[in-house]
């Protein structure tokens, strides 16, 4: 099925590179966190994040979404983690300033990340890429403006469009997120975010916040 809001597989610039690195990216992470599924602790993505007009609360349970950082959008490379994640650091450094942000992204079991947009990319000059590393079987997925995407291949999207995640399985999900400039990905410019720019998007019931209208 053709998607309007998502680039998938070979539509993603550098897809072959990302696929080739998947085993090493996962191996580094598991070596650093052998208890990944049963006890390893990571930094929680802030629970309150988004401006008026979008969900103020980001997910259904505090710390449902966690990150193991490689490059911060404001503070740059998080070099203290280089020994743990050598493949990810090599990848990010190869892109230089064209990479705005990168990190391992963990979604907890039975978690919903409500619809949101990326506060770090308001000018929409970057595109967010998902490199799937461990995806549980079962009821799990991702949507952008109602278009459903599975983590069966690399994909990218404009994170200024409303998007959400659900993981109705007993396991954690792991992907590497990397934000690259649209220019290096040979993509045309995208409009910058502005208040109300997503007001036209219909509700997506599967991840709808029951406390938000």
Positions of predicted regions on the chain:
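Fe(II)/2-oxoglutarate oxygenase catalytic core
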Residues: 1-125, 134, 138, 144, ...
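Trp-centered recognition loops
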Residues: 124-128, 150-151
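Basic nucleic-acid-binding interfaces
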Residues: 131
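Short coil/turn motifs at secondary-structure junctions
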Residues: 136, 164, 181-185
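Short, solvent-exposed aromatic-acidic interface loops
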Residues: 145-148, 181-182
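Conserved metal-binding segment of the jelly-roll/cupin
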Residues: 147-162
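A general secondary-structure boundary signal
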Residues: 156, 177-179
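Ligand-binding loop in jelly-roll beta-barrel domains
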Residues: 161-176
């Amino acid at each position: 099925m053709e998607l309007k809001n998502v680039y998938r597989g070979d539509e993603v610039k550098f897809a072959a590179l990302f696929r080739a690195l998947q085993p090493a990216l996962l191996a580094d992470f598991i070596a650093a966190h052998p208890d990944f599924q049963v006890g390893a602790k990571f930094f929680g993505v802030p629970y309150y994040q988004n401006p008026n007009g979008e969900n103020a609360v980001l997910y259904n349970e505090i710390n449902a979404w966690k990150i193991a950082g490689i490059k911060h959008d404001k503070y740059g490379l998080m070099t203290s983690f280089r020994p743990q994640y050598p493949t990810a650091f090599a990848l990010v450094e190869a892109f230089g300033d064209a990479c705005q942000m990168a990190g391992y992204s963990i979604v907890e079991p039975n978690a919903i990340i409500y619809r949101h947009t990326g506060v770090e990319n308001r000018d929409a000059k970057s595109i967010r890429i998902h490199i799937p590393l461990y995806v549980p079987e079962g009821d799990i997925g991702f949507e952008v403006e109602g278009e459903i995407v599975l983590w069966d291949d690399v994909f990218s999207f404009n994170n200024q469009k409303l998007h959400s995640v659900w993981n109705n399985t007993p396991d954690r999900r792991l992907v590497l997120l990397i934000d690259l400039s649209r220019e290096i990905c040979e993509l045309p410019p995208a409009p910058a975010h502005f208040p109300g720019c997503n007001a036209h998007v219909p509700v997506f019931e599967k991840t709808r916040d029951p406390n938000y209208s």
